[in-house]
Amino acid sequence: MGLFTTRQLLGYTEQKVKFRALFLELFFRRTVNFHTEEVMLDKITGKTPVAAYVSPIVEGKVLRHRGGETRVLRPGYVKPKHEFNYQQAVERLPGEDPAQLNDPAYRRLRIITDNLKQEEQAIVQVEEMQAVNAVLYGKYTMEGDQFDTVEVDFGRSEGNNIEQADGKKWSEQDRDTFDPTHDIDLYCDQASGLVNIAIMDGTVWRLLNGFKLFREKLDTRRGSNSQLETAVKDLGAVVSFKGYYGDLAIVVAKTSYVAEDGTEKRYLPEGTLVLGNTAAEGIRCYGAIQDAQALSEGVVASSRYPKHWLTVGDPAREFTMTQSAPLMVLPDPDEFVVVQVK
């Protein structure tokens, strides 16, 4: 038995709960929802058919010889869930004024909405992790409820992942005389299209900004474009636009996620430089919602299905859960070049 309608819950999560994720906002702006559990990769671009190489992962090892190319892929199903209990509504909430205590009914609503926020954030974290790894490596590991873990590989060319060798390491160069422009141009040439943005972690930024000739060419007066401003909105504390290096927008990212062990980790490994284009055609694909209640309500092809219900018993129990079947697709992984800067 649910106390809130699906329309109310969807309206709340769509309008009130917005977790912006950098790579999703920049490179995966299009969304395609499917009425089937499987995502049809060859139907999402309208151009060249997209295929992915899918390999099983057993005990942490990718068994590529047991994999194969496919154009039909079933996403992992994620459904973060919370239980609300009566004791939570009786106790004072964090930040609540002891002199003006709220009634339990208000606390209950606040806790339920907070639970929905946490569920949305958990799903966005899964989506952003897929997006980041697709950009960094051209592939990612897909997991889900009652789902065999697999590696989804979109076929990145080896030359698009570069590691600076001895003699070429930026950390070995003279800060007053070295000009990184030639290196950056060579890296950009590996991309299948034009490059207009460089995303890096703080380590790479400190190295680059340490070069006198880089600082002289960096244009900090020209404002960022509207697309970039939208992507970094609400991310000001962890994403910084530094300026333009020629036509290249320079962005420093310190975005992070919460790992399974509860620790906070950065999406970008230390020393990572990502070169790409904000016109990249990454696609957020979603398989059908696999819930009988959703089907009865006509909610099948959707990126989210939040629900709230009570179970009758002694005592009764109350739950929230948000379901999704995300699959981030990068049709052309060679649009990006990733450099391990040393």
Q: Residues of each region from the PLM?
A:
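N-terminal alpha-helical "arm" segments
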Residues: 1-40, 329-342
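Short alpha-helical segments and helix-capping/turn motifs at coil-helix boundaries
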Residues: 25-26, 182-185, 306
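Assembly/oligomerization interface modules of large self-assembling protein complexes
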Residues: 30-98
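Intrinsic-disorder/low-complexity loop/linker signature
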Residues: 60, 145, 262-263
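Long, contiguous amphipathic alpha-helices that act as assembly "spine/axial" helices in icosahedral shell
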Residues: 78-156, 179-183, 187-204, 316-323
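Glycine- and small hydrophobic-enriched segments that form the cores of compact globular domains
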Residues: 161-177, 182-183
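Ordered core of a single globular domain
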Residues: 178-236
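Sequence/fold signature of self-assembling virion shell proteins
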Residues: 215-342
